[in-house]
């Protein structure tokens, strides 16, 4: 009788454990078995150390034909379930290529990109220009009907905002104001395919195109909802200008100019993104208050 096959022993990165031990403990426990399953199913050989963010485990692999690729293991949830669909909808330009995917688990096999992100571009203004040019091309694509909608997300935000009670009266007034603004935007919340997390770390260098976008959290909605992630990333570069408020406005204006997004809607939906992040944290991040002040959202 053959001995039972045991799953590969792996050391799960601490950041991944911290992110998922409460919400997805079963997924963490199944990772070794799941890794073996997809290595076998897609005829892959591991070729390097694990990479990871807070949400997924990235495994460098080589396909049977010798092609280098990345195996992405992640819990299946509302953010990940349409990732492959979104990337294939945008494909072949501007985004990483999906080589294989399993819709049942949101597991992806992706083309191997370089490890360099837009965070490595020394000039943050040039990095923003590159990001905005990519964004401008992505936001013209209609969203597939399977993708969840900004209309639903915004409706949930307004409902949750009604129950949020902050200690600071001024911050509470901002929450109430932003919720009112979002409520007015809901009837025209858009139908374009949005990335929802388009910041400098999610744009990687590539051999087939200078820069490619990775890791969307797909949403059907108004492109004006896309700007916020780039506003609050590479924050130290904004601070280093010596005039933080002006640097925020300059970055915002650059993205609006390149993408062609309506400025008033961009301001309104940026207030909505501030509200969303406050609802997630039950508090105002000082950076978000600074952005709100600089853009006169207060």
Region roles according to the model:
Residues 51, 56-62, 70-71, 98, ...:
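Active-site acidic catalytic loop and adjacent metal/ATP-binding pocket
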Residues 2-47:
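Juxta-kinase regulatory segment immediately upstream of eukaryotic protein kinase catalytic domains
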Residues 26-40, 143-196, 206, 257:
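An alpha-helical support segment within catalytic cores of ATP-dependent transferases
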Residues 64, 76, 92-93, 106-124, ...:
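A glycine-centered beta->alpha junction motif in the catalytic cores
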